[in-house]
């Protein structure tokens, strides 16, 4: 039986919001194309730098838009997740 974790910073709820945000990006019109720019950049071997650049961009942009700051954080987190995916691909391709 798993012990219930009492998250101090509502991480469980925030992770749910992150997943919902990522799901929404896959439902946008340009995500329905056969290939996305991110796929081609990763296939060309430039994924890590691309993701790190976008993480920096959204971190630096955070707080500068009125009322839309959460979207910058969600994008930053999504690029961090893609970076983790790239690292797993470099190891053995399997996420355990």
Labelled PLM ranges:
Residues 1-96:
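Intrinsically disordered, low-complexity regulatory regions
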